[in-house]
Amino acid sequence: GKPFIVTESVSGLMTRGYYRMPSDSMFIWPERWDKPFYDASFSCSSYDNCHVPWGNRHEGTMRHVKNNDFISGQYVWTGFDYIGEPTPYGWPARSSYFGIIDLAGFPKDVYYMYQSEWRPDKAVLHLFPHWNWTEGQDIDLWAYYNNADEVELFVNGKSQGVRSKGKDDFHVMWRVKYEPGTVKAVSRKEGKTVAEQEIRTAGEPAQIRLSPDRSTIQADGKDLSFITVEILDKDGNLCPNAENDVTFAVEGAGFIAGVDNGSPISMEKFKDNHRKTFYGKCLVVLQNNGEPGGVKVTATADGLEKATTAIKVK
């Protein structure tokens, strides 16, 4: 009963965008810290069902913290992926799988589990994975949520049932047969809708979307804008398996500070004018060159409609 803080917890392993089913299987990799490990995917499942033998799942550790008053908190290993220590793999893995957020700054799915627990002021509903699979395949759909009594899942308008979390649960799950179309989750409290989320089957890659985290930066030669790059189909749906090589051009008071995509096995340069997308996304970082004025960023890829975004510099 002595009060303490968990100073290094979890050590769960995840690759953003990669899912290994059934989701209630557990993968403890490697067998020992000093024993080489190999899996052809060089990936770890984002269902929170993969961790090191000296650690635990994110949900398992959170359960210990919530259910034991003598634990005042935890330091999760880790918030972000980082270069080096590519547990459980060796070459060509060159960065870690431990993060809640990947190396490019994109949240992995478990980010929303923490948000649902730590942000009671925010209605959270996060349904995953994507909805591009093989016809008839059994797919496990998870939802992290808060501020609600239940979540109902619909596949192409047909209810797949209502789920509620038990005392020690942090997500709800449905196992359904895949059919192209739309999956929708609706969370409710006392019968009233709290939040909704839809995921649609994506078609072929058709266009690029650029989303800067800030549309205005300072003219100090240091300030940055982090621009998310996404590959979309003609209807604006994220293509979850896209690996298009995107090239960037900058005009005006700025330059490319770096690029990334979050892949732990990518050998691409961080300082370059192009990057392949990883599960449909990559990142380009724009830096001011010390001058005021505007900056225009253009993204192009073979066979796709180009995209542009403008950043103000003051």
Predicted regions and their residues:
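Beta-strand-rich extracellular modules
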Residues: R188-E190, T300-L304
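Short flexible loop/turn segments that cap and initiate beta-strands
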Residues: N146-Q160, E196-E198, L224, K234-M267
